[in-house]
Amino acid sequence: MNELTSLKAAAVQFQHQASNKKYNLLIMEKFIEQAALEQVNILTFPEMCITGYWHVPKLTAAQVSALAEPIVDSPSLTLLRSLAIKHQMLIGAGLIERADDGRLYNAYVACMPDGSMHTHRKLHAFEHPAISSGDNFTVFDTPWGVKVGILICWDNNLVENARATALLGADILLAPHQTGGTDSRSPHGMKPVPLALWEERETRREEITAAFKGPSGREWLMRWLPARAHDNGVFLLFSNGVGADDDEVRTGNAMILDPYGRIVNETWAAEDAMVSAELDLSLLAMSTGRRWIHGRRPDLYQILTQPQGYERDAISARFSNVPPSR
């Protein structure tokens, strides 16, 4: 294993087309070629970017199944695997997986330079009743001497998931999303970005930039995302959709954070974009979060694994208007 002192990473935001895998893969190929020119080692695309995202809740179970692909024989992943081998790059991408037992998952696959693949199944899937939630954390070795973990979108909002991924050894967290501009049930959470604003973005540049940087976009991310990197001493690669996604507008904000929660590179452009950065791996060892983790007292934390009686399934927790009871 060739251990490096730094490596190049990149995060992509792009507007996918619903169920149009051919189009989405063409866009992804262009970014992969751009990343190869920049000698990127790790490239991350958004959640469900191959299949499309927010139209899925409106599909029938049969339509969702038809959109899904088995991981091993996936035509989409066959293409990405070949490009990962060609460019000696880790390429992460999201799709709907059809497992051997027929169950469906919101999955994110890391295609490795040697042709192998690592698959994470979203732990808190709420996109469709036909899509099951995964039951395992995902952390794996890379050719560059660092371990990579994956958490998909809402997985990152529950702090336990990020901590568990760090405890399993992750140095870099891939955090693919489809977020921003959602109609949060929380009074001071995200709110919709008008579709008309996106459609008129060329003539309303200041307004669309303000929306993407505001409380339904970047401001919302800044309330919690840097803490996932800082508190766990990991680099974090945030990739996201951008633009109209059915009846919502994704706010992009692709960014890369270091183990201190500092933003190394980001964009708030209202367009398809890629941000890249050199990750200084020497920052990991003495980062604040890693030092704090060594002060843990696991004997006190049994409460974290004990059901409290008010837990809900992901769909209910995400969409219910009934206030949580405690």
Where are these regions (language model features)?
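N-terminal glycine-/serine-/threonine-rich phosphate-binding loop
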Residues: M1-I42
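Beta-strand-turn-beta hairpins that frame and shape the catalytic cleft
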Residues: N2-A9, V139-G149, A170-I172
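Active-site beta-strand/loop signature of hydrolases that rely on acidic residues for catalysis
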Residues: A9, N24, A35-A62, A84, ...
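CN hydrolase (nitrilase-like) catalytic-core segments centered on the catalytic cysteine
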Residues: V72-G92, K147, N156-M274
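Short beta-strand scaffold segments in enzyme catalytic cores
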Residues: A93-L95, N106-A110, T138, A254-I256, ...
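Short, glycine-anchored, charge-dense loop/turn motifs used at functional sites
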Residues: N106, A110-M117, L257-N265
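A short, polar/charged loop-to-alpha-helix boundary motif
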Residues: K122-N136, E271-G289
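Cysteine/selenocysteine-centered motifs that mediate thiol-based redox chemistry or coordinate metal-sulfur cofactors
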Residues: G149-D171, A175-H177, L284-R326
